[in-house]
Amino acid sequence: MAKQTPLYQQHLADGAKMVDFHGWMMPLHYGSQLDEHHIVRREAGIFDVSHMTIVDLHGARTREFLRYLLANDVAKLTQPGKALYTGMLNASGGVIDDLIVYFLTEDYFRLVVNSATREKDLAWIEQHAAPFGIEIREREDLALVAVQGPQAQEKVQAILKAKGLSDADVAAVASMKPFFGKQAGDFFVATTGYTGEAGYEIALPNEQVVDFWQQLLAAGVKPCGLGARDTLRLEAGMNLYGQDMDEGISPLAANMGWTIAWQPEDRQFIGREALTHQREKGTDQLVGLVLTEKGVLRNDLPVRFTDSDGVMREGVITSGSFSPTLGVSIALARVPLGIGEQAIVQIRNRELPVHVTKPGFVRAGKAIVQY
């Protein structure tokens, strides 16, 4: 039996088309995935992401533990509320999951991990936390919603004020830079997201989330489903775990090299030795593709190119879709080193030319890629 978030009945009332997503009944769309995509780029949309897993870590050695567990370095987190995006790797350098870690106090950090990887993530964390004396608490008492788009922050701030939060709390939320989180009353508000737009991700008690959702709808924020969430994150060049990377893929081959903290050299983290060998040897790379001809780039399609030695090389599309913002088809693809600015994708029996770009296409509603 698939699990339901606290917003399940609300989704039905809002007219959602529900689907089973990794064991959770989640809204795919509320009538038009295309309209939902555009509303986030132009105004504001709200997503139920309560299927995500929030894990709180407590203990005097929590920072030390996370410096060992994660490829990015939580030593960078010196200001309370500051967050990092990172991979959690296995010994061979594969990605067990990608996650966000928040520094709250010296003995209290928060992780937000993917729903599809919940059980293995918790088992991995528990296995490695034991020697550090860490208390692990999964926050099943909290729901999680994402309000995203150019009007999102203004709308959320108005509702927080209407809910009786102090002027100081609302001002502190309004002044947060990207990748910060703050506890404001019952709400943990973070300037994070998965769309390439400004906005908040808000954790709040399960029993309060329906009322909060309804207040956002009344303020003109539109409900959005997993379909729009996927096209928005693809336009933003953000990875989806299980497609763009997994336990058999190095972060170096998934456009996650920037999330590996190589310095200081004496920090030993899980996967470091394997990553060092991979970096020396060279790995595949994740690139962007743009198809301006008629057709849609889909997952698993082959990508071919001729390298500088005249050798035909082949990669594969990891995530592909039509881009509503750009009006063309886009994709992320893992390819061997040596690709130029052009490649060929085979769609059924047609070989179509594609432009090779950096893996990111849209930010803040504007194209950031040339093709």
From Swiss-Prot:
It is an enzyme of class 2 (transferase). The glycine cleavage system is composed of four proteins: P, T, L and H. The keyword Transferase applies. This is Aminomethyltransferase. It comes from the Bacteria. It comes from Pectobacterium carotovorum subsp. carotovorum (strain PC1). It catalyses: N(6)-[(R)-S(8)-aminomethyldihydrolipoyl]-L-lysyl-[protein] + (6S)-5,6,7,8-tetrahydrofolate = N(6)-[(R)-dihydrolipoyl]-L-lysyl-[protein] + (6R)-5,10-methylene-5,6,7,8-tetrahydrofolate + NH4(+). HAMAP family: GcvT. Belongs to the GcvT family. It holds the Pfam family GCV_T_C. GO terms for molecular function: aminomethyltransferase activity; transaminase activity. The glycine cleavage system catalyzes the degradation of glycine. Its EC number is 2.1.2.10. Keywords: Aminotransferase, Transferase. One of its GO terms (biological process) is glycine decarboxylation via glycine cleavage system. One of its GO terms (cellular component) is cytosol.
